[in-house]
Amino acid sequence: MSSTATQLATTESTSNWWWDYASMKAPNRDELYYLKFSLLAVAWFLALNLIIHLVAMRKTSIYREMDNKKRTEYRAYIVSPIHAIGAVILSTLAMFFICGDGKTVFNNDECMNTVRYVHIWALLHTCGYFIVDFFFLYFVVKGDSTLDYQTYAHHIIATTTYYQTLYFFDGLCVFGCILLFIEISNPFTCLRWLLYTHGM
């Protein structure tokens, strides 16, 4: 094999590592993995909040003039669509592409009933988002309106449901991942709020 062919083979094998891992059948009830990935997701969303805060403080006077509660809400309207885009991408991959050979969750029972790592990532990515968002809304914003209580309930019920789904570990994991596709409308709602806030 020539050196070019060897380099190409090496590049191909290393470029597909993520896809190979995502499509691998996940082990049943790997609680330590769930904990590690949950902590990683929480750290990611906390870091994202920090980055948005630092950038917004430097780039927009509207954000600088807000009090801490409004800044938290402002960041939530940026973090939320970032989470939603990630959730929709993972959900789409899980529905249509991860099983390979033209198999989808809609035309193949094995694809629908086999929990893969991509399903776990999608669920725990969302749990990490809900945990961080709940923390900021409850402890920083301290909202006490009907909508705030509805949001608290939504976050607690969704997080609990996704962790229970992982505990029971069956087709519900796949179904939970599919349901994340409904996040597709989220960026538009958040964009509307941001445009209104900036007077556009």
What are these regions (language model features)?
Residues 2-181, 186-189, 193-200:
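Membrane-helix and juxtamembrane interface regions of eukaryotic multi-pass membrane proteins
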